[in-house]
Every structure is written in C-alpha cells, then in structure tokens.
C-alpha cells in the first residue's frame, strides 16, 4: 500500500562541471524518491507516476574562464505522469521491492 515513507523530494548533490579544460564541483538539486504505483497482475493502461519536478538552469562561471557552464536545478519535486518524450517509462529489470529498506 501507500505505507512507504520514501516519497518524492528534492535532494542536494554535487556534480562536476567543466569549462576551458578546468573541472569544478558545484552543488545543485535533483528530484529523488519513489512514487506509489499499483502493479496489477494484468496488463492495463494505468498512468505511471515518476518523481520529477520543475527544472530551471543556472550558469556557473569558473574563475579564469570566460565561458559559463549551464547546469540543471530542480525547483520543486512531485509525483507526476511519466512523459515518454523525455523519460524512460518502462519497467526496471529485476526485483524492485515496493518499500525498500535503505
């Protein structure tokens, strides 16, 4: 059921960016988590929900380099319908428990 405590939420992560041959790490925000989905035994056309959000892009200027680096930032996160135009909406291979323990 919906008893899982792992919902969709923003998470701060560090990513590497490169410009002018210089690499730096910056902090950004991504969407992370699981969305409730009943997986019936029969094939149906239920709308699959994924953890996604509103994204914007920011620019980081590395010292000594005139070329800025654009990187994504999640502004908010929620369980939304899976968009096959920009996301893999198929099943994950293998066994994925509905409420994994991390």
From Swiss-Prot:
Compartments reported by the entry:
Secreted
Q: Which UniProt keywords apply?
A: Disulfide bond, Glycoprotein, Hormone, Secreted
Q: Name one GO cellular component term.
A: extracellular region
Q: Which InterPro entries match?
A: Cystine-knot_cytokine, Glyco_hormone_CN, Gonadotropin_bsu, Gonadotropin_bsu_CS
A molecular function annotated in GO for this UniProt entry is: hormone activity
Q: Which SMART domains match?
A: GHB
Task: List all annotated glycosylation positions.
Answer: 12
CDD domains cross-referenced by the UniProt entry: GHB_like (cd00069)
The family line of this record is:
Belongs to the glycoprotein hormones subunit beta family.
Q: What does this protein do?
A: Involved in gametogenesis and steroidogenesis.
Q: What is said about its interaction partners and assembly?
A: Heterodimer of an alpha and a beta chain.
What's the protein called, per UniProt?
Answer: Gonadotropin subunit beta-1
Name the source organism. Thunnus obesus
Q: Which gene encodes it?
A: cgba
């Amino acid at each position: 059921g919906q008893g899982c405590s792992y919902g969709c939420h923003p998470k701060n992560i560090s990513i590497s960016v490169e410009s002018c041959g210089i690499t730096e790490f910056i902090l950004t925000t991504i969407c992370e988590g699981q969305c409730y989905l009943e997986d019936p035994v029969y094939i149906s056309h239920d709308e699959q929900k994924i953890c996604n959000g509103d994204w914007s892009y920011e620019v980081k200027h590395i010292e000594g380099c005139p070329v800025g680096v654009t990187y994504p930032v999640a502004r908010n996160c929620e369980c939304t319908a899976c968009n096959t135009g920009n996301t893999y909406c198929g099943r994950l291979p293998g066994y994925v428990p509905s409420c994994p323990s991390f």
